[in-house]
Amino acid sequence: MTTRFTHFRRAAAGLAASSVLLLGTLTPQATAADTGTAPPPVLTGAQLAASWTAPLSTRDRYVVDANGDRFKLKSGNWAGAQGTWQGSGDVGDVANHQARQMSHNIPLGLDRKPIADILADFHALGLNSIRLPFANAMIRDTSVVPDSAVAANPQLKGKTPLQVLDAVVAAMTTDGFAVILNNHTTSYRFCCGLDGNERWNSGQSTQQWIDDWVFLAKRYKDDKRVVGADLRNEVRRDTWNDPNWGWGNDHDLNKAMEEAGNKILQAVPDLLVIMEGINWQGIPTDLTPHGRPTLTPVATLSNTLIRSDKLVYAAHFYGYTGPNHTGATGTGETHDPRYEEFTPAQLAQVVDDQALFVTRSGQHFTAPVWISEFGAGGRGEIDAKERAWFTNFTDILVRNDTDFAIWPLVGWTDANGTPQDTWAMVNYSANGARLGVMDAGDWRTTDWNKLVGAPGRTGRIAPAPRWNMLNLDYADYNVSATMLAKPDWSPGNRKGNCPDTQRLVGLGRSDSRGLCTDAGQPAKASGPWTVVTDERYVSGGDWASGYDKRQCPDGSFAVGYSVRGNAMSALLCAPATASLPTTGRVLWFDKADNRPATGGSTASDWAPGHYKGQCADTEYVAGVAFTWKWNHGGVPDALLCRPLG
C-alpha cells in the first residue's frame, strides 16, 4: 500500500483482469517448465518451525535467529485487519471497499477458506514470515465480527477483530511462521494520500500510539514467534504539514520511532523493531518541492535502541511511484519519473540510494533492510513497463540478498473466477477455490520463483562490531537500560548514554552528537558508574594545558556525556573488570575532523557540518577537554584516547 492521491492503480488492475475460469474450478499448478524457474520447496509447518529458533535479532546487515543463523525474511502481507473501506459511502456496502473486498477488519479470506488451508498456500509460496497489518481502532473495537466474515472458520464466530487476530497469530506461529505486526493505520480506512492515517499521530496522540504498541507487545510476549513490531506504515504529508526526520517536534518520525522502539523493548526485549522511512514530503506539483525520502535521512541521522541488535529498517517500492512521483494519475501527478521508467542500472542505483545503502557494513546506520512492500498486478496486467519493472526489481532483491515482503497475499475472485485484486498472490472464490501465483497463467510466477528460491547467505552469521550514534540535538538520548532505571544523573542538562553493550568513542564539536561502539569492548564491572563534573580524576599530567577537562577515573571508560547548550558539562564513566592502560594520546578536533583513516563509521557522517573527534576502534575515551576561551563556547575540543590493551 503506497501513497497516491487519486488513482488507485492496484484496485483498478483487479477490475481490468479477465479470466475464463468458472466459479469453483480448480486450476493447474504452474510447473518449472511453465515458468523456466523451479517453484520453491514446500515446507510443512513442522519443517518450517524446526528450521529456525526464536527470537530474532540482527548481526551486521542480517536478521539471525536465536542460534545466530541467518533468517532471511521471505514474507508476504496478509492484509485486512487494517480495514478495507475506502472512506466514502456506506461502510456496509462492499462496493465501497478496496477491490470490492470487505474484510470486516480481520485478515482477508477467513470467510472463504479454513485458516489451515490458507497457511498451506503460504507455505506453497515459499514464505517463512508474515507481515500482519492492523489498525489502532482494532485494539478498542468491541464489536463482534459477523458470522459471514468467518464462514470458513466457524471457531472464530462470536469474536472481536482483536480476538480473531489473536487466533490468526496463534495459528501462524504454530505453523512455523514468524509474525511481524504492522501498525498500518489509525482508523479502519484504506488507503493512502490524505485519508486521516498519514502519521502515527493522525487521529491519536503519540502517547496513545506508543501505549497501543506496548499493549500488543505484551499481549503476544509469550509467543516468541511473534518476532517484530513494524512501527508505522508509509508516513506522509497531511493537508498542512510534512513529517520530518530529526527536527524534534511533533512531526518528527525519527524521534517518535526512537521513543516507541525503546518503550517496546523495555516491555518485551525480544522483539525486532522495524522502522520505515518517510514515504512522502511536499506538495506534488511541478512548482513545489516534493519527494519520497525513504531511508535517505538515515545516512546522517540513524537510530540507536537500548538493544542495538534489534533494529531493522524498511522501505516500500512500487513501479508506478517514483523517488519524486506520488504514483497518481491526474491530480497529484508530476512530470517526475516513475520507478518503472528507469533503466535497470538506474533503478538499481536509486534503490541503493534510497534504501539498500543501509546494509553497508561498519557504519553508524548499518542494519538489515526489509523491503516490506512491493508488488505488481498479475493476471490481466498488460503494462509492459510494469512487468519489466517487477522483473528488474526482483533482480535487485536477488543480487543484494535482500529481505522482502510482497503486497498483498490474499484477495478474492468474483463470480466469474476473475481476481478482484490482481496484485494478490492467492485469490479465493466464494466457495474457496484458489487462483494463485503458483497456478498456471500468472506472468509473475517466474520472477517470484526466482526471488524466493534465490541463493543467498545462510548458516551462522558471526557477530560483528557495531557503531551507533547519539543525537542530543533537542533532548536527552538515553539508550542505556542501566541509566534509564536510575535517577537523572545530570539534572538540567541534555544527556547521551550509549547502549549498555557499548562505550563512547567519538564526539561532535558544537552539535552535541556522539558515537558509540562495542569494537573490542571491555567487560563492565558491577560497581557504580561515575559522573565526572570536575577535574578530580585527571591523571597522567596536564594533557590539555589551559583547557577544562573531564576525565574518567583510571580503570573506567566513558559511556555517556551531558551538555548544556552545546557546551560540555559532565562525563559518565563505567568501571572495567580488568585494568585498562593509563597511557594514551590527545586527539584534537577543534580545527578539523580527526577520525581514523579506517575503521568503524569512517565512511559515514554522524555529525554533518561539524568537526568530529573519534578514537580508534582499539581505544577508549578516557577524557574530554574544552574551553570557554577564544570564543570556543565550552564545546568539546579534544579527546583523551587510551588503548584498550
Residue locations for each model-derived region?
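An active-site-proximal structural segment forming one wall of the substrate-binding cleft
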Residues: Q101-I130, M138-R140, P146-G228, K255-K263
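Surface-exposed, active-site-proximal loop segments in enzymatic domains
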Residues: S88-V94, Q98-S103, N136-P161, R189-Q204, ...
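Lectin-type carbohydrate-recognition ectodomains
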Residues: M469-G645
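N-terminal carbohydrate-binding accessory modules
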Residues: A32-S129
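Secretory targeting and sorting signals
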Residues: M1-D34
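Extracellular glycoside hydrolase catalytic/binding regions
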Residues: P55, Q98-P107, D111, N201-G203, ...
